[in-house]
Amino acid sequence: MKKKFLVKKIITSALPYVNNQPHLGNIIGCVLSADMYARFCRKNNEDVVFLSGTDEYGTAIEMAAFAQNKTPLQICEENRIIHKKIYDWFNIDFDFFGHTTSTAHTKNVQDFFNKIHNNGFFTEQEIEQFFCDKCQIFLADRYVVGTCKFCKYTDAKGDQCDGCGHTYKSLDLIDAKCTLCHSFPNIKSTRHLFFDFNNFKDKLQKLFNTNSQYWSENGKQITKSWLDQELLPRCMTRDLKNRWGVPVPLKDFEEKVFYVWFDAVIGYFTFYKEYVAARSESKELDKNNVFATDNILQDCELVQFMGKDNVFFHTIVFPSLIFATNDSYPLIKKLSVTEFLLFENEKFSKSRGHGIFGLDLVDNTMGQSCLWRYYLAKIRPEKCDSNFSFTHFTNVIDADLNNNIGNFCNRVLKYIKNKNDKLISIDKLEHRDDLMVQTIDKIYKEYLTSFSAIRIREALEKILEISKVGNEYVQQVVSSKIEVPKGFQVAFSIVVLIGQLLEPFIPVSSEKLLKMCNRKKENFCESFYIIKSAEIGDDIKPLFNKLDDSLIERIKNFKK
């Protein structure tokens, strides 16, 4: 049998920018949410590739390198390791995790550009830009600081004022200075390549009309607001100090690089090609052939996860670039957009030291990753901004994991081990059992529907509902004093179901629970059913433990 390489779904997480380590908002905003959905799809017997990678070009990397007296590549290589360490701790199960500084990505971006350029969709324009005579470079927005013309804030950045929030061109700043040497720059002319998005407005509108039914509401609204206005041409090339970007393969533009958002979105296709090439075992699909063709991308469904600040680049920029190639690349089918996660009612800030960042957790001194995966799913900012609160965190872990799910599963398994010699043997179901099965099956199917629609919080709540119904059923059995052993054996099937349903959210805990049940991880079945015969494992112990006082103190006293 030939090995299958084509997949139905390519699930992507917006590429994390590698100038710094991710905080909790970054993690739930795209990477963790995409991981949960990918795990669900795999259990739902769908053909899936989940990929992402670090976004490593642009001025922010250059500035971080300058501040630390390192090269941009050093910054990327060091932080790439940090990112991967954090994602590994969170049990993010990528099928492929790449980086945009790879030679494969450079080639893919340049090939993509050549298609668009050959089709006549780039135009050359001469623009004026700040030029620092002392540094001998054109100054990108991040290399300029000055006084805001709107509010007179004296430390306004080159593209947006932190004082009043206005956006503007860097040339609009008063008394602009170079951030590298603090001298006053001159204004010089430079030629760049522009891409006119308005050429594709009709196609973008058609894409929106066709696929936005599968998009989260915030993604729809943000995209609609752009489509309701004229889409202006945007500069797709840059003059950067270290030429830190994908080089432009065009005569007279050899010293320029592509705008970081031009190359970043193409990264999804690069990483998929790298994924296929790495797994190819046939001469027909060797690495060179994979990168010479785009046929492997046909008939794939693109499902994309991101924060709301990245929507424009994925629903306007990315599809427009695809349209401009005149090739059959997959267009965004499903879109899941998160709002912002606050930390104790304020924005995360590395510079102000406010918030929990990935490296704060990887030593497990504030609990295992399953606790953090669960809580971040619980507060996932799906429809509006949500808030991380230490008090809420500890309350949720105790109420949901210990008192609800943990207590129910432990009660059932301990009874079967101690009172029934670890055995499940059921001949027929009672009327009460049939009613319970109907109730559980209804909630189970709601879980599947919610997760399929990427309503992740809603899916999580369905597990709690199932556990609650299980608790009530067991209590009814005990109170009735009728067929009590049989009742606990019936309840065992609910425990197994919970173990399967938890896997996308907290895979390590799911594995532990299924091991105690002596069951394997399985794909989702069509309906909930009662397991008539089974034998549970020997080592039955609480799935979760109460947060001890010292851990609660460490969490509540954490100051960033």
From Swiss-Prot:
Residue numbers covered by motif 'HIGH' region: 16-26
Motif 'KMSKS' region per record, residues: 347-351
MF (Gene Ontology): ATP binding; methionine-tRNA ligase activity
Enzyme type, top EC level: ligase
GO CC field: aminoacyl-tRNA synthetase multienzyme complex; cytosol
Keyword presence, Transferase: no
Keywords, sorted A to Z: Aminoacyl-tRNA synthetase, ATP-binding, Cytoplasm, Ligase, Nucleotide-binding, Protein biosynthesis
Places the protein is found: Cytoplasm
Pfam assignment, any one: Anticodon_3
Reaction catalysed by this enzyme: tRNA(Met) + L-methionine + ATP = L-methionyl-tRNA(Met) + AMP + diphosphate
Stated name of the protein: Probable methionine--tRNA ligase, cytoplasmic
GO terms for biological process, alphabetical: methionyl-tRNA aminoacylation
CDD domains for the chain: MetRS_core
Residues holding ATP: 350
EC number: 6.1.1.10
Record-stated family: Belongs to the class-I aminoacyl-tRNA synthetase family.
Keyword Aminoacyl-tRNA synthetase: yes
